[in-house]
Amino acid sequence: MEVFDAQSHYYPSDAMSLDELAYWIAFNRVSGIGPVSFKSLLDYYHNDLEAAWRADSKELAQAGLTQKTIENVMKLRTTSTPQRELEKLERLRIRVITLKDMTYPPLLREIDDAPPVLYTYGKLTEADQFALAVVGTRNSTTYGRQVTERIVTDLAKGQVTIVSGLALGIDTIAHTAALDAGGRTIGVLACGLDIIYPPTNRGLARRMVESGQGVLITEYPLGVQPDGGNFPARNRIIAGLSLGVLVAEAPAKSGALITAGFALKQGREVFGIPGSILSNKSSGVNKLIQDGARPVMEVTDILEALNLFMIPQHVEMQAVLPDNDDERVLLKLISHEPCHIDELIRESGLATTIVSSTLTMMELKGMIKHVGGMQYVLAR
């Protein structure tokens, strides 16, 4: 297992019971089930995936699954149980976020093929809605490294979250520069969270999580290897999590251009850092700019285009303003002295599930802190 022993608190789904979540996880493990077929199952079974799990082959075919996928469902049923996989994720402190959860990344939710299930290690925060993807070649030049470090450092200091794919080259430089500048960064994997790829970036992945500055995200279950076909799908998530995509350095056939293509399809901004016309490493990004991508000479070119000058003020306001009555009730009960969740349930009169999910949201927003032992305090 490559998952690290970070000091992270495990949160179940904020929108469903653990039993229900287990069946979402189970179907997400079935080879052949993607966002479209997953939605077909939800529609056919009216969100009751436990019923789908117990259905026979004929009924699953009526729900829209192919014969091969149905065979994969039947095979998985004989080798594992939904509850067993959920227990494994809990032991590893991996959080599962579904499309039904309030904490599902809002920008990613907007895309047509949003993954129904996300596996995360580390913590997403309210500030991560202000994110920019930074992508490029795995074989970067000195120029590519220098300009990426410069732009990302300035973005991170402006509290822009940096999203990339944890690959070698530009991805590694982007993640590292964000961390060095004290900023946040999200690494999107094309494999399960128990398999850090490439292996040489295990230290970087560990640093992202253990520093509290980053989070690892994937749509792939534990054990899934980084097969070639997974990377384009991974790239759509990189773009989907972001307000825009910056291509730092890329040759004509770079995978970074696939990410830029997803961004355009998703209605997001695309930026490029101009490179030498004599360098093959910049031919892809130069063509991208020629075709209409915004050229970036300095960080203000990005901040102005995305209106990101006021991030600190916006995050501060979001962190202290309750969004609903449940948050208002709990905010009145929580002080700078630790308060146990049982006391909050008793004093608020709210249901246990409501208190649990609301506390999760309040912590993600930076309103409160979990201090261990199911106790909470105000964050400020």
Task: Say what each PLM segment does.
Residues 2-102, 367, 372-380:
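Short, small/acidic-rich helices and loops at N termini and domain boundaries
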